[in-house]
């Protein structure tokens, strides 16, 4: 609830939706480069490269923030882009795909990483490949949405209006 008014004020919901998808795509690409790849010596001494681990955690934090922001924008966007009689139908579709994405992220991607690890005997490599697959999927969705999601006239930033004041933000909160 606290972040939502800022999303409304700063840019359009379409812009937030696509930009957050781009940010998540970039984060997943960077994750393929930062997943710790300790040397045999580090493995033997049971130490890890903390700087790469820290960067990996930072990228996951950015991804979580982008995902939450995307959710806020997408919730508002479909209400602007669809006629009222189609909104209930879309809620069902969106909920279904949200659940499928959870299963894919928590099940299929983990199974892919596990299968790669079994064949390669390299855990970091298996996760780098899995993050790359995720980055490709997110990038494809972002590219598609950039060109094909509608541009409703009612999707406007409220920056510069009375709704953009700090008082209005806290009143809404």
Outline where the language-model segments fall.
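Helix-to-loop junctions at the C-terminal end of transmembrane segments
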Residues: 1-12, 113
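Cytoplasmic membrane-interface "Motif A"-like loop-to-helix N-cap segments
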Residues: 8-25
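Helix-to-coil boundary motifs at intracellular loop junctions of multi-pass secondary transporters
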Residues: 9-10, 77-82, 115
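Helix-breaking motifs and short loop linkers at transmembrane-helix boundaries and internal kinks
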Residues: 11, 34-35
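Intracellular loop-helix junctions on the cytosolic face of multi-pass helical membrane proteins
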Residues: 25, 35, 40-57, 69, ...
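Helical-face signature of the major facilitator-like transporter fold
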Residues: 59-64
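Intracellular juxtamembrane helix-capping segments at the cytosolic ends
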Residues: 65-82
């Amino acid at each position: 609830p606290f972040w939502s008014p800022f999303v409304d004020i700063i840019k359009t919901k379409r812009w937030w939706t696509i930009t957050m998808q781009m940010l998540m795509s970039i984060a997943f690409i960077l994750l393929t480069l930062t997943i710790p790849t300790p040397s045999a010596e580090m493995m033997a001494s049971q130490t890890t490269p903390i700087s790469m681990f820290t960067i990996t955690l930072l990228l996951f934090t950015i991804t979580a923030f982008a995902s939450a922001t995307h959710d806020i924008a997408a919730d508002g966007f479909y209400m602007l882009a669809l006629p009222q009689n189609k909104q209930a139908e879309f809620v069902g579709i969106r909920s279904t795909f949200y659940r499928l994405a959870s299963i894919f992220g928590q099940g299929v991607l983990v199974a892919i990483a596990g299968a790669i690890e079994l064949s390669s005997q390299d855990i970091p490599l298996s996760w780098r490949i899995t993050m790359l697959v995720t980055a490709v999927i997110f990038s494809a969705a972002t590219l598609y949405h950039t060109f094909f999601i509608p541009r409703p006239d009612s999707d406007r930033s409220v920056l510069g209006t009375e709704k953009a004041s700090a008082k209005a933000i806290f009143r809404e909160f």
